[in-house]
């Protein structure tokens, strides 16, 4: 039952590309991403595909791209090292976000409904503040961050850094890099946890890419790299003579 299920997929906006009898979708266990427990519920990472094989989620295209890059890059790497059997894609994401006091959030219908401001006036000082970026983190925010990091580590998300970002009340969290598929799953899980922990501390977290006009938005930088199963970083020039050719070859 865990390996494959057949839920209804007829309500997805697929533009009528399937006949009614083909409206079913298939969920399948993704064994490359570990299962985890939240609130007493076992959560199993899955993919979701149509009867005819089209992707009905974002994980399937990601896994297909990982497979394609692995196949192409491994063939290239074996010109330099016959011991290479697999090329791994690594990802280190950076999660930027804004924290807003819940009482202030509650009087802004635009924030409540859309997660961003749709009206208002710019403040007298925005990013001109010189004491915010990488400055001392407020005590209340530190308490939120510590609680968030504890919950993340319980779920295996290897969070590592935290700091003030450029805009007022903007912050950032980043983990140790992981394999691409797992890193993506962990980021999706993190955003869910952030919302829950923020409410616990009487905050609301804004994850919209541009919640306020006139100041920095919240980017999500993706630090992507390639490495072989023999431990070679393909985006590093290396110290051995033949590895000097690997980087320009991979880039080409």
Where are these predicted regions, by residue range?
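Alpha-helix N-cap/helix-initiation motif
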Residues: 58, 62, 86, 137, ...
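ATP/Mg2+-dependent ligation/transfer catalytic cores
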Residues: 1-146
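Core alpha/beta catalytic barrel or barrel-like domain that forms the active/cofactor pocket
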Residues: 39-49, 83-100, 112-135, 154-177, ...
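Well-ordered mid-protein domain cores that form the structural environment of catalytic cofactors
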Residues: 173, 184, 189-192
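Secondary-structure capping and boundary motifs in well-ordered enzyme cores
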Residues: 65, 140, 165-166, 182-186, ...
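Generic, well-ordered alpha-helical scaffold segments in large soluble proteins
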Residues: 72-80, 144-158, 190-201
């Amino acid at each position: 039952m865990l390996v494959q299920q057949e839920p209804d997929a007829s309500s997805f906006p697929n533009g009528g590309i399937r006949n009614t009898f083909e409206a079913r979708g298939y969920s399948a266990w993704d064994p490359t991403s570990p299962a985890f427990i939240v609130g007493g519920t076992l959560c199993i990472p899955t993919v979701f595909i149509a009867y005819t094989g089209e992707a009905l989620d974002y994980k399937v295209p990601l896994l297909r791209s990982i497979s394609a890059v692995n196949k192409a890059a491994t063939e290239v790497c074996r010109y330099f090292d016959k011991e290479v059997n697999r090329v791994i894609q690594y990802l280190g994401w950076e999660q930027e976000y804004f924290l807003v006091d819940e009482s202030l959030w509650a009087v802004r219908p635009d924030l409540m409904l859309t997660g961003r401001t749709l009206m208002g006036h710019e403040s007298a000082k925005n990013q001109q503040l010189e004491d915010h970026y990488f400055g001392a983190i407020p005590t209340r925010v530190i308490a939120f961050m510590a609680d968030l990091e504890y919950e993340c580590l319980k779920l295996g998300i290897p969070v590592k850094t935290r700091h003030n970002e450029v805009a007022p009340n903007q912050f950032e969290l980043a983990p140790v890099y992981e394999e691409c598929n797992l890193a993506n799953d962990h980021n999706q899980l993190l955003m869910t946890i952030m919302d829950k922990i923020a409410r616990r501390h009487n905050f609301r977290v804004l994850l919209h890419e541009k919640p306020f006009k006139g100041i920095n938005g919240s980017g999500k930088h993706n630090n992507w790299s390639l490495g072989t199963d023999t431990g070679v970083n393909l985006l590093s020039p290396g110290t051995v003579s033949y590895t000097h050719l690997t980087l320009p070859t991979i880039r080409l």
